[in-house]
Amino acid sequence: IEMGDVWGNNSVLSSIGPGGVFAEAYACVPGEPLMVNVTAAEDTRALLLNIRRVLEPCANVCPRHVRLVRNLLTLCSEKNLQLSRRVLHTGPKSIRKRLLSYFSECIKRTGSYSFDIPYNRQQLADYLSVERSALSNELSLMQRDGLIRYEKNHFDVMEQIDS
């Protein structure tokens, strides 16, 4: 999911895997202009839901309907947390601190200092709101300094880093 401005600059907001949900906030706020673009990286099928029918339960209040609403609320909450984390990662002024913030989240999420990320270099640069060449340069410097090792989207972060 990307957000683009009128000058053609894109910023990656998130990525979605199989079974993921997108644009639910727009569906729940009628008339809100769509500010994001969704691009599939592979063949994809999408299920479109009539949000009005989802949010107005039937007279029987069937368990499946309640479960659907609960699942959508959970997904919205998870997405809110994901966007909040992105704000935290793009807050630091230096690219290194943005990377360390993102890596810290990855370590906490996976429970390991060795992890894969769901982005290529351009997508990671967009996610962190930095230029790709500057990001690649900083990753090289961090590897040279012995802070990280990486190959493509796999990273090994050293356990002791003085930020």
Q: Where in the sequence are the language-model features?
A:
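Short, Lys/Arg-enriched, Trp-marked, Pro/Gly-tolerant hinge/linker segments that flank
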Residues: L83-I95, T110-D116
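Short hydrophobic/aromatic patches on the structural cores and recognition surfaces of FHA
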Residues: G19, V38, N80, L99, ...
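Cytochrome P450 core scaffold surrounding the K-helix E-X-X-R motif
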Residues: I1-G8
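Long cytosolic regulatory regions associated with cyclic-nucleotide signaling
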Residues: A25-Y26, N71-K79, K93-I95, E138, ...
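Phosphate-/nucleic-acid-contacting segments
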Residues: R98, Y102-S163
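Inter-domain helical "communication" segments and dimerization helices
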Residues: C58, C62-V69, T74-L88
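Cyclic-nucleotide recognition modules
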Residues: V12-R70
